[in-house]
Structure formats: C-alpha cells, structure tokens
C-alpha cells in the first residue's frame, strides 16, 4: 500500500505531506512520489512497532518503537486513516504469526529431539547390559556347567531386537535434525575470505619456489652444489700437496741466520730500512770490525 500522509516534522514547519509506502512489513516515507527512486528519508519495521490511535483526532495515528522511533502521522480524513490502520495492522499480524509459527516449530522439534536422545541413551544402556550377559555366557567358568543353547538364543534375540530399536530411533533422530537444521543453513553463500582460496601473489610464488623447489629445480640445485664441492675438494688436495712439498724442503732455512738484521727507527715506524740491503749491511759490519780493532790501541 502507498499514499500521502501528513507527518509531524517540528514546531517550525509543523505537518508536512509525505509519500508513504508499505512493503514487506516495512513502512518507508519520501518527500514525494517522484523521490521514490532517490531513496527513503526514513522507515520503520511493523513487526517491532506499536500502533496507537489518537483519542480526540480521528485522522491521527502514531507508530512507536519504545526508546528508538516515534512517527506522528495524520491522514486526509478518517476513512483514509482507517484504510492505513487496516493495512498496517494486517502487516504486523502476518509477521507476528509467521514468527510464532517458526518459534513453535523450532520448540517442537527441539522437544522431540530431546525425547529421542533420551531413548537412545536408554537403548545404549540395554545394549551394554545384553552384550555383557553374552560375554559371561561365552567366558563361563570351566568348573560350572556350560550355558544352555536356549539361554544363548534368548540373549542373542534380545540383543538383536535392541539393536534394531536403537537403529530405528537413531534414524528418527537424524530425520528430526534434518528437519530442524535445513540444508540452506550449511550452504556458505559468502565464503570466509580467510578460508577461501586466494591466488598467491608473485612474491609468495617466489618464496614458495625458493622454499619448496620442484623435482627439476632440486636436481639442478644438487648438481650445482656438487660442482663447487668437487672444486673445493680438488683445491684442498692441491694445497695438501704443496704443503707436503714445503715440508720435504723444510731443511732449507727460510732466512739466513748469519745475515745481520738491523732494525732502525724507520723500520719500527713502518719505513724500509736501508740496512736491509746486503751491500750496506756488509759496509756496516766492516766499519764495526774496524772500530773494534782500534779500541785496543786506545786502551793500550
């Protein structure tokens, strides 16, 4: 239903005409009929609101959601208000009846499911007792007489009947559960983004290729690893050979111990000393020997 109703806005503008539309239990209003495509200025859900009729004015009515919304509306005449009251009341009643039916169905299925579950527990206890009885018959003490075939047949028939009843009750529980929890509830129309498969980014693909290489890449990598390892092994063998050669020639001294080594201040500072040259060292040794020869003459 749709039509014009006056809505109380504020004390400055007072009652203003608005275009109201009642659809699927929701009452929405617009500035005019032409503004329906632009979107509503407000709405109220009939299932949760209260309809109140003004006691003095036969054209006024109120829609109230306690603590949330309060619509003051006025029709053109009493007949128009009555027409709106019937439409609003019918919409509210239909929604309420639908809700109560669903609640009744849910409560009834819950109670029946509880009853069947209690029956299953009872049959489970009976099964355990009957299985225990048959075990006692089978593992009977040798000192006593063996159980009769009649007792065994009776116990097995009771066990078979209890099993059949248990299975039947279990099937009824499954039917009740399927009626209560419909398949639509288990269909995920909007899958969770954390669970839904997402195409990996290029960076993730690179990481995956590095951390989890395929068979071909593993063969290549193993081959590339073997090559440097073999190269290192060859180098180490060569070094061992050179070390063994140097050890065999270790009788030859690396430095001549008779050669005098003169360390001057310059050599301590990191400069090359001139005394390290063989000719200059010989001259220095010659001068030193001459000075030693002249010392006895002075002493004498």
From Swiss-Prot:
Could you confirm whether the keyword Phosphoprotein appears in this record?
Answer: yes
Q: Does the keyword Membrane apply?
A: yes
Chain intervals for the UniProt region annotation (Disordered): 197-300
Q: Where in the cell is it found?
A: Golgi apparatus, trans-Golgi network membrane
Which one of the record's GO molecular function terms can you name?
phosphatidylinositol-4-phosphate binding
Which InterPro entries does the entry mention?
Boi1/Boi2-like (IPR045188), PH-like_dom_sf (IPR011993), PH_domain (IPR001849)
Q: Residue ranges under compositional bias (Basic and acidic residues)?
A: 279-290
Q: Which GO terms describe its biological process?
A: endosome organization; receptor recycling; retrograde transport, endosome to Golgi
Instruction: Pull one GO CC term from this UniProt entry.
Output: recycling endosome
| Tissue expression notes | Widely expressed.
Q: Which keywords does the record carry?
A: Golgi apparatus, Lipid-binding, Membrane, Phosphoprotein
* Top-level taxon of origin: Eukaryota
Phosphoserine: residues bearing it = 236, 244
Q: Give all residue intervals belonging to the PH domain.
A: 1-93
Q: Where is this region: Interaction with SACM1L?
A: 1-100
Residue numbers spanned by region Interaction with VAPA and VAPB: 97-300
This protein's major location comes to Golgi
Q: How does it sit in the membrane?
A: Peripheral membrane protein
Provide the function of this protein: Plays a role in regulation of vesicular cargo transport from the trans-Golgi network (TGN) to the plasma membrane. Regulates Golgi phosphatidylinositol 4-phosphate (PtdIns(4)P) levels and activates the PtdIns(4)P phosphatase activity of SACM1L when it binds PtdIns(4)P in 'trans' configuration. Binds preferentially to PtdIns(4)P. Negatively regulates APOB secretion from hepatocytes.
Question: What is said about the domains?
Answer: The PH domain binds the small GTPase ARF1 and phosphatidylinositol-4-phosphate (PtdIns4P) with high selectivity, and is required for its recruitment to the trans-Golgi network (TGN).
Describe the protein's quaternary organization and the partners it interacts with: Interacts with GTP-bound ARF1. Interacts with SACM1L and VAPA and/or VAPB to form a ternary complex.
Could you identify this protein by its name?
A: Pleckstrin homology domain-containing family A member 3
